[in-house]
UniProtKB/Swiss-Prot annotation:
Membrane-crossing segments per the record: 286-306
Family: Belongs to the protein kinase superfamily. Ser/Thr protein kinase family.
Topological region Cytoplasmic: 307-633
Keyword terms: ATP-binding, Glycoprotein, Membrane, Nucleotide-binding, Receptor, Signal, Transmembrane, Transmembrane helix
A Pfam family matched in the record: PK_Tyr_Ser-Thr
Membrane topology: Single-pass type I membrane protein
GO MF terms held by the record: ATP binding; polysaccharide binding; protein kinase activity
SUPFAM superfamilies: Protein kinase-like (PK-like)
Official protein name in the record: Probably inactive receptor-like protein kinase At2g46850
Record InterPro entries: Kinase-like_dom_sf, Prot_kinase_dom, Ser-Thr/Tyr_kinase_cat_dom, WAK_GUB
Species for this entry: Arabidopsis thaliana
Domain Protein kinase: residue ranges: 355-633
Length: 633
């Protein structure tokens, strides 16, 4: 049959739209103005940033400040005025109200403060208590901090001062969130002093640090697209916005937002000024006038070629049939392990509506996963495996053969496959009713289910890696490749060609998955680095998924979240040299999940509630015969 010449109206329309958009961009680019940080309000040496404001137009009255004598800032809370000493990204250091001069010790009632949804006393304060009757309040090691007196000298016996009984609020044993300093009167204390000792340092600043945050559901809590949301440490249900690395600003959509930051010629620049090359308006106008006609001619030529291009058969795609038809008989699949069906490419193409983007579930290093419906109404997952040549085609066919023989309750059931020569290999999985883990995390998922899911995934990956020959490595483990059945049990899909995959990259991918479980956010390389920094600096609560309400969780669950974050850290740090592998991660996660029988979880899973022995890998991570998935006959 001679080739068909069919005009493509959709392609022509696409080119026409592209042409119009390009012309609009070229003609308007000279009118664009570079971004710049808005100038903050000033009071003496202080720069006032969002959400704080001096003007009466502030949408949140709680953050309205007053400037006296054009130099002194005050914060007003419940009819009390606190002089501001210093601003921080997460709080502000204030002086004692109604205190005209610095005192070595203050009365326990001299700092009246009631925590609210905007402000709370920070954990970073260290308290020096005077004349306490109960010495159990004093904490060993606290006095090693450099705490300075009113004269600027360090408080110690040689300088004539003494901090008395030293107590860090981060201890939480005597003082808790919401308390004021009068709580120390229970221990017979008669006075106190306060210093801010930032985390990671031992040098104190005299005053009381108040943490600030905005209620999670407030319109002012919306973050800029280049910022992330962090939970407040001492204010339940409130958050702050923090710009990503390389960006500056307050992070809030209604504030200055986040602008790109860079240095040029010794000066710090922001926004569009950080672009590598700048042109003035006249140059851009000339450039647009030259490029526009050239683009029009090129588009018309491309459109003409497109309309005259013969429509080719699908069989011409990806592989040369003439050189590969003899290999069909060499593709062998074992029978009897799992009743699988051999699909045609056309069947799966129809099931996925021609592999439309609307059917796409996720895309990764191993290929693309689609949602589809077979002609009998069965909903399925179709994995179009990435394949570049005949050798990879044969390797993938062998791996699918091997994978089909593995029966495990956390391995998504393989319904069938398509190995038509000339197309990418297609693997068809059963579609679990609760969709992908990534989608469920965006909708909200309680901690019990999260930790059970990653424990199951770790057990499966360790089993495939160490108890199968040849070993099976998942080269793209992610929340998009993990699906959940009606009981929220994990069903892993997305196995692809094991090109030169190393175990350390698998451990890194698994660490990213654990961080997503903790934060509820899809992780990128830069966000992984930021999350690990927060974990190592003791600020885990700032990255925990806000939908889990970290401070409202039972203590046991908060400890478990910390343990999972620690496992993620070790996967990154020690996964590359083999000091911490998937077996180690599986052992610890299964132990965490196995302890969740009480404490608010519905019930233990059959596979998790077993007691595993350290003497055997199979005893430790494999599932009992009852937990292995057997297809119905």
């Amino acid at each position: 049959m001679p080739p068909l010449f069919l005009p493509s109206s959709s392609s022509a329309l696409f080119l026409l739209l592209l042409l119009l958009l390009t012309l609009q961009t070229l003609t308007s680019i000279s009118l664009s103005q570079p971004q710049a940080l808005r100038s903050p309000e000033k009071c003496g040496n202080f720069s006032v940033s969002f959400p704080f404001q001096l003007s009466s137009s502030s949408s949140a009255a709680a953050f309205r400040l007053s400037c006296e004598n054009s130099s002194t800032l005050f914060l007003h809370i419940n009819h009390q005025s606190y002089r501001i000493i210093e601003f921080f990204t997460d709080g502000l250091l204030v002086d004692f109200p109604s205190s005209p001069s610095c005192r070595q010790f203050n009365d326990l009632r001299s700092f009246p403060f009631s925590a609210n949804q905007f402000f709370s006393i920070s954990f970073e304060n260290v308290i020096g208590l005077y004349d306490c009757e109960d010495s159990s309040l004093c904490k060993f090691g606290c006095e090693t901090n450099d705490l300075f007196g009113c004269d600027g000298r360090e408080e110690d016996e040689t300088s004539g001062g003494d901090i008395g009984c030293c107590y860090p609020l981060s201890d939480h044993s005597a003082w808790r969130v919401g308390d004021d300093f009068s709580v120390f009167s229970r221990y017979g204390c008669r006075g106190f002093s306060s210093w801010l000792v930032p985390r990671g340092t031992n040098r104190g600043k005299r005053g009381v640090k108040l943490e600030w945050a905005i209620p999670r559901n407030s319109p002012e809590a919306i973050c800029d697209r280049e910022a992330r949301t962090v939970n407040a440490t001492a204010i339940e249900g409130s958050v702050r916005c923090v710009c990503r690395d390389g960006f500056v600003g307050d992070g809030f959509l209604h504030g200055t937002g986040c602008l790109k930051s860079c240095f040029k010629d010794g000066k710090e620049l922001y926004g569009d000024k950080c672009k590598i090359k700048k042109h003035n308006g006249k140059k851009l106008t000339v450039l647009a006038g030259v490029l526009a006609p050239l683009f029009i001619l090129g588009s018309l030529l491309a459109l003409f070629c497109l309309l005259k291009r013969p429509v080719t058969s699908h069989k011409d795609q990806q592989f040369d049939i003439s050189t590969t038809t003899t290999t069909t008989n060499s593709v062998s699949f074992r029978k009897g392990y799992n009743k699988t069906r051999l699909f045609t490419y056309r069947e799966l193409e129809e099931a996925t509506k021609g592999f439309q983007d609307s059917q796409k579930l996720t895309q990764g290093k191993t290929g693309t996963i689609y949602s589809g419906n077979l002609t009998n109404g069965t909903r399925v997952i179709v994995h179009k495996v990435l394949c570049e040549n005949q050798i990879e085609f044969m390797e993938i066919s062998s791996q699918i053969d091997h994978l089909s023989a593995v029966l495990h309750r956390n391995l998504a059931r393989i319904i069938g496959f398509c190995m038509d020569i000339g197309y990418n290999p297609l693997v068809v999985y059963e579609y679990p009713v609760n969709g992908s883990l990534g989608d469920r995390l965006r909708l909200g998922l309680d901690w019990c289910k999260r930790v059970n899911i990653v424990a199951e995934v770790a057990g499966l990956l360790a089993l495939l890696q160490y108890e199968n020959y040849p070993p099976i490595l998942h080269t793209n483990i992610s929340s998009g490749n993990i699906f959940l059945d009606e009981d929220f049990q994990a069903k892993v899909t997305g196995f692809g060609l094991q090109r030169k995959q190393r175990i350390d990259t698998s451990m890194y991918d698994f660490a990213v998955l654990l961080l997503e479980i903790v934060t509820g956010l899809k992780q990128r390389e830069e966000t992984v680095t930021q999350a690990l920094q927060k974990i190592r600096s003791g600020k885990l609560e700032e990255i925990v998924d806000p939908s889990m309400y970290f401070h409202e969780q039972p203590v046991a669950f908060r400890e478990q979240i910390g343990l999972v974050a620690d496992i993620a850290t070790r996967c990154v740090l020690f996964g590359g040299d083999g000091k911490f592998g998937m077996v180690d991660a599986a052992r610890e996660l299964l132990q965490i999940a196995g302890n969740n029988g009480g404490g608010g979880c519905d019930k233990k899973r059959d596979g998790i509630e077993e007691t595993f022995s350290n003497s055997s890998l199979l005893q430790m991570i494999s599932m009992s015969p009852d937990s292995i998935y057997l297809p119905k006959t």
